[in-house]
């Protein structure tokens, strides 16, 4: 996270949610000699969203991955010091992710962006269900205080679709089993 200058990270510890991380972890365990996992680490890096990457950011991320590999001893280090975590870094277990679902279908007006910090009950979006009618707008509030991790790219949504993800200060209000995108 420090090498990539991440604002947030989801922490996962081998469980049974069948997440991508677990699939990678199982491969590592299968290849470990005698079950010795000392010095081993599994991580997945999601390099931004579809709308967020430009050449400068891609280069910064590539350099960050290279620095991570240097730190793990995979690539020979250079003279630069290892980076530290950001002062505002958010690292929480995956169970702290609140998936905010759309209660209705319609057009989305976001009031927050990824990287914003929100308070419980704060309006994070509105869904327009019936344009021009006062009752045709549904306000969406944050279920708890936390960090906006992602939000939907498309501005149209169906009832029940993922609207945004918030890494909460506490475990998710709507606790769920399985991978985030089930």
Could you say what each language-model-derived stretch is?
Residues 1-182:
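Structured catalytic-domain cores with a bias toward divalent-metal coordination
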């Amino acid at each position: 996270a420090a090498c990539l200058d991440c604002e947030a990270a989801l922490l996962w510890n081998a469980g049974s949610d069948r997440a991508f991380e677990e699939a990678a972890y199982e491969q590592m365990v299968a290849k470990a000699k005698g079950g010795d996992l000392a010095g081993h680490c599994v991580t997945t890096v999601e390099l931004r969203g579809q709308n967020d990457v430009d050449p400068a950011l891609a280069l910064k991320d590539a350099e960050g991955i290279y620095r991570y590999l240097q730190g793990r001893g995979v690539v020979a280090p250079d003279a630069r010091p290892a980076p530290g975590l950001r002062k505002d870094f958010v690292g929480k277990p995956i169970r702290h992710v609140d998936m905010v679902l759309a209660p209705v279908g319609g057009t989305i007006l976001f009031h927050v962006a990824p990287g914003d910090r929100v308070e419980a009950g704060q309006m994070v979006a509105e869904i327009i269900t019936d344009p021009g009618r006062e009752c045709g707008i549904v306000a969406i509030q944050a279920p708890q205080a936390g960090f906006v991790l992602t939000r939907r790219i498309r501005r149209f949504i169906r009832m029940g679709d993922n609207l945004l993800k918030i890494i909460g200060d506490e475990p998710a209000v709507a606790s769920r089993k399985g991978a985030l995108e089930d």
